[in-house]
Curated annotation (Swiss-Prot):
Summary of the function given for this chain in its UniProt record: Part of an energy-coupled inorganic carbon pump.
Subunit (UniProt): Forms a complex with DabB.
GO cellular component: plasma membrane
Family: Belongs to the inorganic carbon transporter (TC 9.A.2) DabA family.
Annotated Zn(2+) binding sites: C329, D331, H488, C503
Listed name of the protein: Probable inorganic carbon transporter subunit DabA
Transcription regulation as UniProt keyword: no
Family matches, as InterPro entries: DabA
Length: 800
């Protein structure tokens, strides 16, 4: 079949590149971070993205209608919310009553266009989509393996060449009924470009049909396409390119060609209709527009509640020198701990800043040669650091132990020796099994020698970095005697997603290395002298101490040994007591949300429980991002649902810090928020399924069962507590106290960030001089004034 003119390689490559960029990247498990599953659709509205994803995968982008109807019925969503949302898209319904009527009616299910594999399955009764997913998955698990496999696949070839070598010896497709598949593969052109051009022309694809059809083929590969997209992402960060994802597209296209060659007579006519449907422009239908309006209305309801929170009484500004200042990551889990800590005494002040603390190191841990990229995945490393100490003997001993452990592990898993291992050494593990089963194993706390820059940088560069970071934190005066810089990390067992519970701003690692590095920088006497010349004076009696906040148990570890100071012994003792008390208060609050947690002791036990699928809720529930002075949120409960970034625009000359916040932390927070959103509204596609069925493959990700499609996104247990959702899928509300003109100027310069707000993947609000949500960004650089939630209550004195 070829009813169209020949496709040009240029057009095919352009469409293939667009399809590749419609796929989000997937980071490996060792350093996994949240990724926006709609990353390739942010230039479109929610309804239009729903039409596109519906065509290629049948993906819902909102909750079922009944979800919204229930919230309309119980008053959560008011008529005012519905009317305001309808004003954004007035063509969705004739009026308010019509919109309510739509909410009561179930929408039509999104059905994807069939692939050739689907059509061949219908014609033959053979599950070709399942077979090709299994065969491609089996090959991809070996090809992308990151050290889990005992017999690793060679990486000398590109993905296309490696697959051809594999597929010519794979008889499973022929056994299943695809005659001559191995021969077909052996006769494919030597280059992926030639192979994809031949296949596309043989299938009769038009230029117009390529866009969504090629996207669909990559979409059917699930996480394997996302692993390939990750390779392209990393290559482009380094100023290079990578063809893995286009090779994967060629592989999937060749499967279509092979199936078409066998079943053309049975499916040819139906296939022509599919090609024509792919060629039609993507457009949202009435159902999708109604759904988008209902989602908007629900978010308006949440924003009403947020505005009420901002209108609550705030503690009076206190310029006296605090006894303790503690800087935490902006992560929503920090909000609960910060609130608990500040409630103990007015002498404690907390700050919020991105958890990488402005440093972008490629770090080598103690006795390790692995580069850990402890920085946001949007950036390249700007520094190198190490925890290698001066004790060469200790380093070598640790390396010997690590090698012995790896060798022992391979002996346990090898094809032959594994049987002898179980027979000979099984009883030795009885004690360990009992200890682990009873949750008696101690929590692991990252330690090691104090990290340092290696190589170091000159004093001017160190001073520049210190000034930039302190100004970005709006932290340039009134320093306490003790300033704790707290990174964060999780402490769990038997959890492939452990790195996803760590600090996203640190690339999926815990944040203590960055915190300790910054503490060392700010304790440097020469750096402090340089800062004085730049208008920042840190008192001689101020000491900075790195720390780690364990978000699973809310324990705090201080690394005071990095900078021993007898003069601060009493300060440290008092701080540790405060942290213990705050941890207890925080655990009590978290226990109210966690299933089967009856008290603070249960929280500690959960972190060591092999069978616990919900050791913590991580960022479930996130709904807001606030960049403002701490005074605007202090003393108010944001329920662990808000990212809190300290920012004082009056100290920000030229609005460079504001630009950094809007283009980095806000974007990272959007990735987190939209990953939770996608894993909730479409768990079958954008979620990784049931933890109880997971098998780790290749150190990359997980599959459900014994192979097939790599699952991505969050497990079901991360967004659902068994009876109801733990996460409410709300697009993030970003609240910034800064002039609207400054924010608009930044949006003008950054098209990608502007698209997030213009297309309502994020909502933007300007806080006024009283910290109230006063202005809403409507898109296209336009703002509208908001009704005052209630009269702002005056500041109040804080009781000592």
């Amino acid at each position: 079949m070829n009813t169209n003119s020949e496709l040009s390689l240029e057009n095919l490559n352009a469409a293939g590149d667009a399809a590749a960029r419609a796929i989000p990247p997937l980071w490996p498990l060792a350093s996994s971070v949240a990724v926006n599953p709609y990353l390739g659709q942010t230039a479109e509205t929610l309804a239009l993205a729903g039409a596109r994803l519906g065509r290629v995968g049948g993906v819902p982008v909102t909750m079922p209608r009944a979800w919204y109807a229930a919230r309309i019925a119980d008053g959560t969503i008011t008529d005012a919310d519905l009317s305001a949302a309808l004003a954004v898209n007035p063509t969705a319904a004739a009026d308010l009553e019509a919109l309510k009527a739509h909410a009561e009616q179930p929408e039509s299910a999104q059905k994807p266009l069939p692939t050739l594999a689907d059509l061949a399955a219908d014609a033959s009764g053979i599950d070709w989509p399942g077979i090709l997913a299994d065969r491609i998955g089996l090959w991809a698990a070996g090809y992308f393996d990151q050290g889990q496999a005992l017999w690793a696949a060679p990486h000398r070839r590109g993905a296309y060449d490696a697959w051809r070598q594999y597929a010519t010896h794979d008889l499973t497709p022929e056994i299943a009924g695809l005659s001559g598949f191995a021969q077909f593969v052996s006769e494919t052109p030597d280059t992926a470009d030639q192979a994809s051009t031949r296949a596309a022309n043989r299938l009769g694809l038009s230029d117009a049909a390529l866009e969504t059809y090629l996207h669909q083929l990559l979409f059917t590969l699930g996480g394997w396409a996302q692993v390939a997209r990750y390779r392209l992402w990393q290559a482009e960060l380094a100023g290079k390119s990578d063809a893995t994802i286009t090779d994967m597209l060629t592989i999937r296209l060749l499967w279509e060609e092979a199936l078409f060659a066998q079943y053309e007579e049975e499916i040819g006519a139906e296939w022509e209709k599919v090609v024509a449907a792919h060629a039609a422009p993507v457009a949202s239908d009435a159902d999708l527009q109604v759904n988008a309006v209902l989602q908007e209305a629900w978010e308006r309801a949440g924003q009403r509640d947020l505005a009420e929170t901002f209108s609550m009484p705030a503690p009076k500004a206190d310029d006296t020198r605090p006894a303790l200042q503690a800087a935490f990551c902006i992560d929503v889990r920090s909000e609960v701990f910060r609130r608990a800590l500040e409630s103990l005494t007015p002498d404690i002040k907390t700050l919020g800043f991105a958890g990488f603390f402005g440093l972008t190191p490629a770090h080598k841990g103690f006795a390790s040669d692995v580069d850990e990229l402890r920085l946001p995945v949007l950036l390249n490393p700007g520094l190198t650091s190490t925890s290698q100490g001066d004790d060469a003997e200790a380093d070598q001993t640790a390396r010997f132990k690590a090698r012995a452990s790896r060798a022992w592990g391979r002996f346990k898993l090898a094809a032959v020796s594994s049987f002898a291992f179980v027979e000979a050494t099984g009883p030795i593990y009885a004690g360990k099994l009992v200890r682990d089963a009873l949750n008696m194993a101690p929590n692991d706390v990252p330690g090691g020698p104090m990290p340092r820059l290696d190589p170091s940088v000159d004093l001017a560069a160190q001073t520049d970095a210190a000034e930039t970071i302190l100004r970005a934190m709006s932290f340039t005066d009134n320093f306490a005697r003790l300033v704790v810089l707290a990174g964060h990390g999780a402490n769990v067992v038997n959890n492939p997603f452990a790195s996803g519970l760590h600090c996203g701003a640190c690339g999926g690692y815990s944040g203590e290395v960055n915190a300790r590095l910054l503490a060392g920088l700010l304790n440097n006497v020469d750096v402090r002298r340089g800062l004085v010349e730049r208008g920042i004076t840190i008192p001689d009696d101020t000491i900075f101490v790195g720390a780690l906040h364990d978000t699973t148990t809310d324990a705090m570890t201080l690394y005071e040994a990095d900078h021993p100071s007898k003069a601060h012994a009493a300060d440290l003792k008092q701080a540790k007591a405060w942290f213990l008390s705050a941890g207890s208060v925080t655990r009590a609050e978290r226990a109210l949300r966690l299933p089967r947690a009856e008290g603070t002791d249960d929280i500690n036990l959960r972190s060591r429980d092999w069978a616990e699928t919900r050791p913590e809720w991580a960022l479930a529930g996130c709904k807001a991002f606030v960049a403002a002075p701490r005074q605007r949120t202090a003393g108010r409960s944001l329920e662990g649902r808000a990212f809190l970034h300290d920012y004082d625009w009056q100290q920000d000359k030229g609005f460079g810090v504001l630009e950094l916040i809007m283009t980095a932390p806000v974007v990272v927070a959007s990735w987190i928020s939209l990953q939770y959103y996608g894993s909730t509204v479409s768990p079958d596609v954008f979620g990784s399924g049931n933890k109880l069925l997971h098998n780790v493959t290749g150190g990359i990700g997980v599959v459900e069962g014994n192979g097939g499609t790599l699952r991505t996104g969050l497990p079901w247990q991360s967004v659902h507590e068994g009876e109801d959702f733990a996460h409410e899928p709300l697009r993030l509300s970003v609240c910034i106290e800064a002039p609207r003109e400054a924010m608009s100027d930044i949006l003008k310069r950054h098209d990608g960030v502007r698209a997030l707000f213009d297309n309502r993947w994020l909502h933007l609000f300007a806080l006024d001089e009283n910290g109230q949500m006063a202005w809403r960004y409507e898109g296209d650089l336009e703002w509208s004034q908001m009704p005052v939630a209630s009269e702002a209550i005056p500041e109040t004195e804080v009781a000592a």
